[in-house]
């Protein structure tokens, strides 16, 4: 096992995992290259957290192959954990330790800490490190975990819904920090069900559904997934909106217009509606669940499977 010479920090092929009769992973493939911020996307229950638990050596796979920093996450867990940092979506801390003590303890498990970066991150995230962990809100517990991971010497970050509990200002700080980590050459696997967060941070994306990889590639190659829902209350007649390229699923009921529009055509559609006269207009990016329903035709069997599968 080598953690020093690896062009592919994460290499997963045909990964399977069952929990009783529930199939959590069903032949999953995932490749994350060195220095990459890689989005790992899927609706809740798709198998993202199970995959991360296998990478962390907390769960043993039933089948397939997994290489993490050149090693086996199940048999080489102790050595590998000196080079990786993990941030879960719901952080649990030692209640009697202060935030600062917890940051240092976690970082020591990861091969040490950059004290200057630690101090900078505490200030940027607005954390009081002298308070006991038992007094922290969910957002502050999340900050402790993020600060420890980002100030450590880890070469690989495994992030499972890491911005959960952060307010919009702190989420912006988090995104800046991930960009800085990438500039330092750190590899990041970001598990999320939020498409916008992934678009802001990641250059590559792997999308999974029901424990299988359904798409993987650059964000530019996956732009067809990103459509915005439009609902407008009209004053005038907008005309034939189907003539606008990238506008689909158009429905008109009385004065209410609904449509789906590609990001490249959104501005043109809004201009056309505005010229016709609009009382109100609401635009909403699609949820991942909507994207999967639209692009991958989720059937009731798969939907039910996702409800019971380990996330």
UniProtKB/Swiss-Prot annotation:
Origin: domain of life: Bacteria
Family: Belongs to the ABC transporter superfamily.
Assembly information from the UniProt record: The complex is probably composed of two ATP-binding proteins (Rv1218c) and a transmembrane protein (Rv1217c).
Alphabetic keyword roster: Antibiotic resistance, ATP-binding, Cell inner membrane, Cell membrane, Membrane, Nucleotide-binding, Translocase, Transport
Enzyme class: translocase
Protein name as it appears in the record: Multidrug efflux system ATP-binding protein Rv1218c
The protein's Enzyme Commission number: 7.6.2.-
Membrane-spanning parts: none
An example molecular function term from Gene Ontology annotations: ATP binding
Induction: Transcriptionally regulated by RaaS (Rv1219c). Expression increases in multidrug-resistant clinical strains (MDR-TB) compared to drug-susceptible strains.
Membrane topology: Peripheral membrane protein
One CC-aspect GO term: plasma membrane
Organism (species): Mycobacterium tuberculosis (strain ATCC 25618 / H37Rv)
Binding site for ATP: 42-49
Inactivation phenotype: Inactivation of the gene leads to a 4- to 8-fold decrease in minimal inhibitory concentrations (MICs) for ethidium bromide, novobiocins, biarylpiperazines, bisanilopyrimidines, pyrroles and pyridones.
Domain ABC transporter: 10-235
BP GO annotations: response to antibiotic
């Amino acid at each position: 096992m080598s953690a020093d010479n690896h062009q592919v920090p994460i290499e997963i092929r045909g990964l399977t995992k069952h929990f009783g009769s529930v199939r959590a992973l069903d032949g999953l493939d995932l490749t994350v290259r060195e220095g990459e911020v890689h989005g790992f996307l899927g609706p809740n229950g798709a198998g993202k957290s199970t995959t991360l638990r296998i990478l962390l050596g907390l769960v043993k796979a039933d089948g397939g192959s997994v290489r993490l920093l050149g090693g086996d996450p199940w048999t080489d867990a102790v050595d590998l954990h000196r080079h990786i940092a993990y941030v879960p979506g719901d952080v649990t801390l030692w209640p009697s330790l202060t935030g600062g003590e917890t940051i240092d303890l976690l970082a020591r498990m990861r091969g040490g800490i950059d004290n200057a970066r630690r101090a900078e991150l505490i200030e940027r995230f607005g954390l009081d490190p002298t308070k006991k962990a038992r007094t922290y809100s969910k957002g502050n517990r999340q900050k402790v975990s993020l600060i420890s991971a980002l100030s450590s010497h880890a070469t690989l970050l495994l992030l499972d819904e890491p911005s959960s509990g952060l307010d919009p200002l702190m989420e912006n700080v988090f995104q800046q920090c991930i960009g800085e980590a990438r500039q330092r050459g750190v590899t990041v696997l970001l598990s999320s069900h939020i498409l916008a967060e992934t678009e802001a941070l990641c250059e590559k994306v792997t999308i999974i559904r029901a424990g299988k990889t359904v798409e993987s590639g650059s964000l530019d190659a996956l732009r067809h997934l990103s459509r915005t829902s439009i609902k407008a209350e009209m004053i005038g007649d907008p005309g034939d909106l189907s003539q606008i390229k990238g506008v689909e699923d158009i429905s008109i009921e009385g004065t209410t217009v609904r449509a789906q529009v590609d990001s490249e055509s959104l501005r043109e559609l809004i201009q056309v509606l505005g010229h016709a006269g609009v009382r109100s207009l609401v635009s909403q990016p699609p949820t991942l669940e909507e994207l999967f329903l639209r692009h991958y035709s989720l059937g009731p069997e798969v939907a039910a499977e996702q409800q019971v599968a380990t996330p």
